[in-house]
Amino acid sequence: IRRTPGGRGTDGWVFKDLKVGDQVKIAGPYGRFFFRTARENAAIMIGGGTGLAPLKSMVRHVLETGTGQTMYLYHGVRGAADLYDVEFFRGLAAEHPDQFFYRPCLSEEDGVEGTSHGLVTDVVMGDFPTLRGMVAYLCGPPPMVEASLKMLMRKRLFPRDTYREDFFDSSDKATGGVRSPLIRTS
């Protein structure tokens, strides 16, 4: 868990009251950010930081239920220390080579084996001449989600085929967060 200065959840509870070994009850999820298995389109999935977590759940669901959609998962972080579940995703990619593709992207660190260097949006831009006919799932910090939306539009993937989940912290809320008039929020 990353501490957010002034955050109600981290400063006001996790780092203030909890100790290693404490048990917590978690409920949910209650949102509308889920994989649409009725859509047979290939999916481009872009997660920033901890935005990878819901995408991991989607990937597992699709592979376990055998619905058959092809998935391209990109995980954007600053450096290799911010990556997680790398071996898990590499294992899935090896096990499902025609259905699942995984690409970790480091924006501030270069030369790390098995990763791409650059902003996750730039890496996706370079990998696909067009994204027409696909669906997109975006999850992470609002600036990354907004940059991804713009990139998807340039690559011919439009709002009706895009699902998103923004992670807001207390600093985002103080400024009103980041919202796009181009897309529905899941």
Question: What positions do the PLM features span?
Answer:
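Ferredoxin-reductase
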Residues: 1-23, 41, 77-79, 105-108
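Short, Lys/Arg- and Gly-enriched loop/turn segments at beta-strand edges
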Residues: 9, 31-38, 175
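Phosphate- and divalent-cation-binding pockets in alpha/beta enzyme and binding domains
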Residues: 34, 54-57, 147-148
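Short, compositionally biased
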Residues: 36-49
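Short, flexible hinge/linker loops that cap or flank conserved catalytic cores
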Residues: 36-39, 65, 130
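Histidine-anchored nucleotide/phosphate-binding helix
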Residues: 56-64
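Reductase modules of NAD(P)H-dependent flavoproteins
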Residues: 70-186
